[in-house]
Amino acid sequence: MAHKRMVREAIVDSGVTAVLRGIDAEDIVSVAEAVHAGGVTAIEVTADATRCTEMIADVDRALADTDAVVGAGTVMDAPAARDVIEAGAEFVLAPNLNENVVEVCNREGVVCIPGVMTPTEADRAMAAGADILKLFPASTVGPGHIGALQGPLGDVPVMPTGGVSTENVAAYFEAGAVAVGAGSALVDYDAIEREDWDAVRDSAAEFVAAVEDARS
């Protein structure tokens, strides 16, 4: 469980998890390396990709000697959780709450971040053993929803994802977020098309700087 604790701390310390979605398997390592070079240490490969387990394993191998932690997102059920963990995922995220996924993660000693929106879902997730709560889609409720959850439930760890940008990330941290998830606001997809890895790095670095400013 010491490794699980370290991974959770890395996610929180990083402040932002890069969501790598819709990226070709041939580009995934280059993108992950560029994002990591930009200062992101928590990297999520979404499990809705056709070759997701291969991609997770490739990224895990490529960043093995760094401070990066590699996880899987969009993990909807227990079989998918088992598959991505076997591929090397150190943390698992989902847009939904499936207690079976939480159970698999706890059994395997892997950080679990299920998706929640309501106090009932948040309470169920924490009771099941979730490590962090993914507020998704955060854009539909905004930063104030974090306080609305923490008011009755106490200081539950919330990670808003969906619509988080450099413009609003400070508001989410001020509201009590422990970290955020970011996709297109952090990952420069146009630069990926051009194979301009320096631009991908710089886009990630800009988001990391916004997170650091928000937390300072």
Locate predicted features.
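C-terminal binding/interaction regions
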Residues: 153
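Glycine-rich beta-to-alpha transition loops that act as phosphate-gripper elements at the mouths
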Residues: 21-25, 49, 72-78, 93-98, ...
